């Protein structure tokens, strides 16, 4: 298929810059978001994304449809619900979901859409808002290899490392492993910042020195400076990380993952402090405001 027209559903912190990068790479890009008032939606429109108010209009002519929304219920409703994407997408359109919804939900979506003459890839992303803006996301893809190969040029417009992980649901499985690391690394960065302040050492010194050695991590480089400055603007929201950690626990069938249990507890404490819509760097609040 010669892909020229793309629809992006969900023009939030991640979806908006992804749509903008598609425009920059020459794709005719239509965008849909439930609420048009969000600044991220306006930014997409200014960058050349044709923002529409109807799921039907957005989906009808798209060769590839990207979805980037909150959780598995949102994805299922958007795609399979009454008046959803599946009702209006053209035959054999390729739907690519970039949300984190878990392996089982992705497999069920793929199976259902195949019965309706549509194709599906689960393609969760990581790299945060910075990666979405810069087009350097890591994308973990599950689904038929032929669909992956067709989607690859499009995915290269929004990501840097794009990996076919296996059949439907495999991208989600790898993403859950990724989220274990993200949650625990954020805690490690927060504890390092907290300790540096208690010891009278500038957090910037710790970030610079430790970040270049074996203790370096994405969280230390990107989240720790925001922790130090109490800059909690999202990025990746606490409520979304908690959702992902729940999916991890469910996938593990509540098996022993004590690090995940700790991460859930600490991020829940931030949520109870009113921080559910703050970025994951707000984990430092669990230490400063406990």
Swiss-Prot record:
It is an enzyme of class 1 (oxidoreductase). Keywords: NAD, Oxidoreductase. One of its GO terms (biological process) is organic acid catabolic process. GO terms for molecular function: NAD binding; NADP binding; oxidoreductase activity. InterPro entries: 3-OH-isobutyrate_DH-rel_CS (IPR002204), 6-PGluconate_DH-like_C_sf (IPR008927), 6PGD_dom2 (IPR013328), 6PGDH_NADP-bd (IPR006115), HIBADH-like_NADP-bd (IPR029154), HIBADH-related (IPR015815), NAD(P)-bd_dom_sf (IPR036291). NAD(+) binds at residues 7-21, 100, 243. SUPFAM superfamilies: 6-phosphogluconate dehydrogenase C-terminal domain-like (SSF48179), NAD(P)-binding Rossmann-fold domains (SSF51735). Its EC number is 1.1.-.-. The active site is at 175. Belongs to the HIBADH-related family. This is Uncharacterized oxidoreductase slr0229.
